[in-house]
């Protein structure tokens, strides 16, 4: 059944120009936690990425991998401000959630364990500036200590557990989310809000990641939803008692709208308390 709140246009999906994201990007920290450098090239309406890690890798040692999708800043936008890419070959599988803000590239990198009995899932959220043509690039970058302390289940519950309501009560995004811990990680239940009323996104499995180099064991979550005409990739964290969800919405049918990236903010309801700042 068509969504009454969505346009019924038969036009092709809106094209998104990825030009603004391409370039050579250098980590703003002299001792990166996850990635040191990111190269981005435009390939038609997609992007190709090559990332340099900080643990002995060279740019020549990692092949290019293409973006899965690019995203505008709104459903009517035409310029890309974000993309998602996955690299699952070799010894460094990694998922990238990337967006641009105020001239900086924000890269959230998710590293799953190589083996089921391997290390914990690791996460880093880092900021990149465009490389100076005269700069030596990554040769002066050195890795920061990347040890990760395993996140206890009680810590994850304290951080995310319970129900969270959107601070924006009038938008067309998400009304509320609820997190519950499971043996394999957690689940996230989402009550969406279309242009007329709230709607149930259902429950999705959540992956819990430990932040590289963190001293207070902060966690990040990652999940995805298939909503029929749209799929949503998201990740989230809690800062100063507020849950922040970064949402990558991709329309799968030709409705004349742009896939788009945005962030939504939530306050906790119920009895759970958060010990992380």
Regions found by a protein language model. Give the residues of each.
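Amphipathic/hydrophobic helical signal segments and adjacent flexible N-terminal regions
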Residues: 1-33, 46-48, 101-172, 216, ...
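Central antiparallel beta-sheet cores of small beta-barrel/beta-sandwich binding domains
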Residues: 19, 26-93, 158, 165-233
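Exposed beta-sheet edge/beta-hairpin loop segments within beta-rich domains
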Residues: 95-99, 234-237
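A generic structural micro-feature
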Residues: 88, 118-120, 226-228, 237, ...
């Amino acid at each position: 059944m068509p969504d009454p709140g969505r346009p019924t246009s038969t036009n092709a999906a809106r094209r998104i120009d990825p030009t603004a994201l391409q370039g050579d990007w250098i980590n703003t920290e002299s001792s990166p936690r996850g990635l040191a450098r990111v190269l981005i090239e435009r390939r038609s309406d997609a992007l190709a990425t090559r990332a340099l890690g900080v643990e002995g890798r060279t740019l020549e040692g990692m092949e290019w991998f293409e973006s899965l999708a690019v995203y505008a800043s709104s459903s009517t936008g035409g310029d890309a401000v974000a993309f998602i890419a996955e690299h699952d070959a070799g010894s460094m599988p990694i998922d990238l959630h990337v967006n641009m803000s105020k001239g900086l590239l924000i890269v959230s990198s998710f590293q799953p364990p190589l083996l089921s009995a391997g290390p914990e899932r690791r996460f880093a959220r880092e900021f990149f500036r465009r490389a100076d043509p005269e700069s030596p690039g990554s040769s002066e970058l050195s890795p920061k200590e990347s040890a990760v302390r395993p996140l206890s289940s009680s810590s994850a519950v304290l951080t995310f557990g319970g129900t969270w309501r959107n601070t924006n009560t009038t938008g067309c995004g998400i009304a509320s989310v609820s997190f519950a811990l499971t043996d394999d990680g957690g689940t996230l239940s989402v009550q969406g809000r279309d242009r007329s009323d709230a709607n149930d996104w259902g429950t999705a499995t959540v992956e819990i990641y430990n932040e590289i180099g963190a001293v207070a064991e902060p966690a990040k979550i990652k999940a995805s939803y298939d909503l029929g005409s749209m799929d949503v990739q998201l990740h989230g964290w809690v800062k100063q008692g507020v849950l922040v969800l970064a949402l990558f919405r991709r329309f799968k049918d030709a409705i004349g709208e742009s896939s788009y990236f945005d962030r939504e903010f939530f306050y906790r309801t119920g009895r759970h308390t958060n010990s992380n700042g």
